Amino acid sequence: HYTGMRSETKALKRLTDDKAKVSCHYFIKRNGQIILMVPELYEAWHAGKSKWKKDISLNKNSIGVEITNKGHDFGYQSYSKKQILSLIKLTKYLIKKYKIKSSNILGHSDIAFERKKDPGEKFPWKHLAIKNIGIWHKIEKRKLKKIRKLTISDFESNMFIKYLNKIGYFVKNLNIKKKLKLVKSFQRRFRQELVNGKIDKE
């Protein structure tokens, strides 16, 4: 997650306010400091209404990490090098401890694409995948760009949605608005340079 608030102080205050009904297990400050907010054995309220594969409401079986970032509403910024170094260290520890599969390293927008954009298109998913955290494709960007403007058939478009479902995205009862948000969620993770919600050959 990113915090999506104007300041780090406000984010910490909200995450420790019982009335807000939102929390996380770990908080990573802009300077890279890691704060344990909720012990791992306890459920934190970070995922909210969420779905991935066959799981619904992922609070009960996930570990939530919040990273300081103003987000799309208040001036979305690149994550600091110190934040990413701390995130890599923390995530590697959690992967080893709980034997977490790479395909289950997720962003908030993966599990709640209808209402969330975080961690967003500036989150370094490719860099993390190189460090064996999460997944990334192996197709050269140059080759992908060449086919971006080619016409795509309805059959191919429908197959793309089916493949998203196979990965883990929840694709039932999609209307035009939900479909747009779903595709944008995928693009924010795997094609960060162009997030337009359009299904194309790339």
Please name every model-derived segment.
Residues H1-S103:
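Active-site-adjacent loop/helix surface patches within enzyme catalytic domains
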Residues Y76-F170, K181, S185-R188:
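Basic/polar, cationic surfaces and motifs that engage anionic cell-wall
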